[in-house]
Amino acid sequence: MFTLKKSLLLLFFLGTINLSLCEQERDADEEERRDDSEERDIEVEKRFLPLIASVAANLVPKIFCKITKKC
């Protein structure tokens, strides 16, 4: 009976440590996610800038052609 209590106590202790480590890791992940929002904004800007540039490259000659009437 004593060895059973000892092993259960050991399992409880190890489980508590494991749970504590998981909480610390989860907290670190949440902090990292909060920092990622700035990186996501930069990535979104990088994705949209080429799109805007290509649309502008297509529209500017057409507008210039209509204004000057030299097509």
UniProtKB/Swiss-Prot annotation:
Domain of life: Eukaryota
InterPro entries on file: Antimicrobial_frog_1, Frog_antimicrobial_propeptide
Signal peptide: 1-22
GO cellular component: extracellular region
Reported tissue expression: Expressed by the skin glands.
GO biological process, one term: killing of cells of another organism
Compartments (UniProt record): Secreted
Residue numbers covered by the propeptide annotation in the UniProt entry: 23-45
Key words of the record: Amphibian defense peptide, Antibiotic, Antimicrobial, Cleavage on pair of basic residues, Cytolysis, Disulfide bond, Fungicide, Hemolysis, Secreted, Signal
Main localisation: secreted
Cystine residue pairs: 65-71
Family, similarity comment: Belongs to the frog skin active peptide (FSAP) family. Brevinin subfamily.
Function text: Has antimicrobial activity against Gram-positive bacteria and fungi but has weak or no activity against a range of Gram-negative bacteria except P.faecalis. Active against the Gram-positive bacteria E.faecium 091299 (MIC=37.5 uM), S.aureus ATCC 25923 (MIC=2.4 uM), S.carnosus KHS (MIC=19 uM), B.licheniformis X39 (MIC=2.4 uM) and R.rhodochrous X15 (MIC=1.2 uM) and a lower activity against E.faecalis 981 (MIC=75 uM). Active against the Gram-negative bacterium P.faecalis X29 (MIC=9.5 uM) is virtually inactive against E.coli ATCC 25922 (MIC=150 uM), and inactive against P.aeruginosa and S.typhi.
Protein name: Brevinin-1V
Protein species of origin: Odorrana hainanensis
